[in-house]
């Protein structure tokens, strides 16, 4: 039993166009799918691969059934399939397959090839099966140690600065400008005027008691101003 071409309705069909859902002979296939590039990409299934012995249709029981409806769980011929699954009806959305297990009205060949390639490509499966690689953890920031060293350097610099400041103020401390008890060397010593030998002899001559006619007159202390310097003379009591 052969399937008739849906275009010319004279020659037997050699293939089925899934996009057009039509059985075509070789001549009509060239005319229909050579019209444009989009039509040339339609997926087509050759009927040579189908079995020559088809089961009878579950509805009419006369014609050979090569369409299987999943929802109705029935094998249908083309005429019964069109009558049962008419467009704009609820049954039009039923899933239907050819007797070989290939779904009817699939998308274009290029789309199916991409789907099959992604589905059966071992490289894609390996990429999907591989767990996501964990990125190495970023190194912990070194701000704590840097801050510690910076603070230590700051403390050292402050200590050195204090030592320098104290070193500069040592000479003020030696002069007794602060409230601390000064050293004995820093205290000013009262200087005793140095007298030359001539001054001492001259002073000794003045220390001698002068003879006076007045016996009861008391001895007086005399002061002598020499070179605009005041000298205190101790009387000789011997």
From Swiss-Prot:
Residues 226-238 are annotated as: Interaction with COP1. It is found in: Nucleus. COP1-mediated ubiquitination and subsequent proteasomal degradation of BBX25/STH occurs in the dark. GO terms for biological process: negative regulation of photomorphogenesis; regulation of DNA-templated transcription. A zinc finger (B box-type) spans 5-47, 57-99. It comes from the Eukaryota. The keyword tRNA processing does not apply. Zn(2+) 2 binds at residues 57, 60, 80, 85. InterPro entries: B-box_zinc_finger, CONSTANS-like_Bbox1, Znf_B-box. Pfam families: zf-B_box. Zn(2+) 1 binds at residues 5, 8, 28, 33. Acts as a negative regulator of seedling photomorphogenesis. BBX25/STH and BBX24/STO function as transcriptional corepressors of HY5 activity, leading to the down-regulation of BBX22 expression. BBX25/STH acts additively with BBX24/STO during de-etiolation and the hypocotyl shade avoidance response. Interacts with COP1 WD40 domain. Interacts with HY5 and HYH. This is B-box zinc finger protein 25. It comes from Arabidopsis thaliana (Mouse-ear cress).
């Amino acid at each position: 039993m052969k399937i008739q071409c849906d275009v010319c309705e004279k020659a037997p069909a050699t293939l089925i166009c899934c996009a057009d859902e039509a059985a075509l002979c070789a001549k009509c296939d060239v005319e229909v799918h050579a019209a444009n590039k989009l039509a040339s990409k339609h997926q087509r299934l050759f009927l040579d691969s189908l079995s020559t012995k088809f089961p009878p249709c579950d509805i009419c029981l006369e014609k050979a059934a090569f369409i299987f409806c999943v929802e109705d769980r029935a094998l249908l011929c083309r005429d019964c399939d069109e009558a049962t699954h008419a467009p704009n009806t609820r049954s039009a959305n039923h899933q239907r397959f050819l007797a070989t297990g290939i779904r009817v009205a699939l998308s274009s060949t290029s789309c199916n090839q991409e789907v099959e390639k992604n589905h059966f490509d071992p490289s894609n499966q390996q990429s999907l099966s591989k767990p996501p690689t964990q990125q190495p953890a970023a190194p912990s920031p070194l701000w704590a140690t840097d801050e510690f060293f910076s603070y230590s350097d700051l403390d050292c610099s402050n200590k050195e600065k204090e030592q320098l400041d104290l070193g500069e103020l040592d000479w003020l401390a030696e002069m007794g400008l602060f409230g601390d008890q000064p050293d004995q060397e820093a205290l000013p010593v009262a200087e005793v005027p140095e007298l030359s030998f001539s001054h001492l002899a001259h002073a000794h001559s003045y220390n001698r008691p002068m003879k006076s006619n007045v016996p009861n007159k008391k001895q007086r202390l005399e002061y002598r101003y020499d070179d605009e310097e005041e000298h205190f003379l101790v009387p000789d009591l011997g």
